[in-house]
């Protein structure tokens, strides 16, 4: 009876020891690709949201900075009267304050060159389109930053069409910023050709290219998450691993099959040996005695 109990106890111990192993394999090895894919997806979402926040802060820096141009480093290639030179400097200074700057001081309102400034910097088509696109870029950048941070809220983690809307907002933002960065120097070059001067561009303009790269990266990451790029990579890697593991097995099977076929086609060594004279049975002699 004791021996039976010990056997039963040993069997129960073995089954208990095997059960966690199978459960560990079931819960750790199988969902490993799922965990890696979803962790990569979440990391891409975090990077996209933080890049959008950084890009929006740089946009605000562009709005409030007054270093779009360097008026002190401007060079005149033609001599002008003092009043015209003053007008040119005033125009360059108003342009260096950025696309969202509006002069409301008394000096701007009561100056004699007020009409000239409006004609040159606000009524000019390239400058007007650049100002509108920059205003839209700032507003859309705020919307995109808020949108990409919504998944941090637990109740909004499963929003439909989240990735698609993020892609559309990101690439619209990239288009608006690129249009602004393209039209601003075009307007400046037209003015330089008209007045025969050269004005260097400031660091606030070049920050816009960094903002463009950040928003473009956000759009690419949103596109990869929307197309389930990380799960596709994990599935392709698992398929390659299974194919590589099945190749040696198939080679072993083919070698075994070829060996068995060779054994069937070739006769054995016993069949190939010639019969000796001792082993040959002679027929009996006929009886000649009558």
From Swiss-Prot:
Q: Name one GO cellular component term.
A: motile cilium
Q: What stretches pass through the bilayer?
A: 44-64, 132-152, 164-184, 201-221
Q: Pfam families from the entry?
A: PMP22_Claudin
| N-terminal signal peptide | none
Kindly give the Gene3D superfamilies that the UniProt entry links to this protein. Answer: 1.20.140.150
Where does this protein reside within or beyond the cell?
Membrane
> Residues annotated as region Disordered?
262-290
Q: Name one GO biological process term.
A: cell differentiation
Classify the source by domain of life.
Eukaryota
Which InterPro entries does this chain map to?
Answer: PMP-22/EMP/MP20-like, PMP22/EMP/MP20/Claudin
Residue numbers bearing the Phosphoserine modification: 28
How is the protein disposed in the membrane? Multi-pass membrane protein
Function description? Component of the outer dense fibers (ODF) of spermatozoa which could be involved in sperm tail structure, sperm movement and general organization of cellular cytoskeleton.
| Listed PANTHER family | EPITHELIAL MEMBRANE PROTEIN-RELATED (PTHR10671), OUTER DENSE FIBER PROTEIN 4 (PTHR10671:SF94)
The name on file for this protein is Outer dense fiber protein 4
């Amino acid at each position: 009876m004791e021996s039976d109990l010990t056997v039963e106890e040993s069997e129960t111990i073995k089954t208990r020891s095997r059960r966690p192993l199978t459960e560990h394999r079931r819960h750790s090895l199988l969902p490993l690709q799922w965990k890696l894919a979803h962790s990569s997806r979440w990391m891409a979402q975090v990077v996209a949201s933080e890049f959008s926040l950084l890009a929006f802060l740089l946009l605000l820096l562009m709005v409030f900075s007054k270093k779009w141009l360097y008026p002190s480093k401007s060079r005149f290639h033609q001599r002008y009267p003092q009043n015209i030179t003053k007008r040119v400097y005033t125009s360059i200074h108003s342009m260096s304050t950025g696309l969202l700057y509006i002069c409301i001081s008394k000096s701007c309102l009561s100056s004699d060159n007020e009409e000239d400034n409006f004609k040159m910097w606000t009524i000019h088509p390239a400058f007007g389109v650049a100002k509108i696109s920059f205003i839209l870029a700032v507003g859309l950048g705020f919307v995109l930053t808020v949108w990409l941070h919504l998944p941090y809220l637990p109740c909004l983690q499963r929003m439909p069409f989240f990735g698609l809307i993020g892609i559309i907002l990101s690439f619209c933002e990239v288009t608006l910023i690129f249009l602004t960065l393209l039209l601003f120097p075009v307007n400046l070059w037209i003015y330089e050709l008209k007045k025969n001067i050269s004005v260097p561009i400031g660091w606030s303009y070049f920050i816009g290219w960094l903002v463009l790269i950040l928003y473009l990266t956000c759009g690419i990451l949103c596109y990869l998450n929307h197309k389930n790029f990380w799960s596709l990579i994990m599935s392709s890697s698992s398929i390659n691993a299974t194919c590589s593991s099945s190749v040696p097995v198939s080679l072993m099977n083919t070698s075994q099959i070829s060996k068995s076929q060779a054994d069937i086609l070739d006769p054995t060594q016993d069949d190939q040996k010639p019969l000796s004279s001792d082993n040959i049975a002679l027929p009996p002699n006929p009886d000649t005695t009558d």
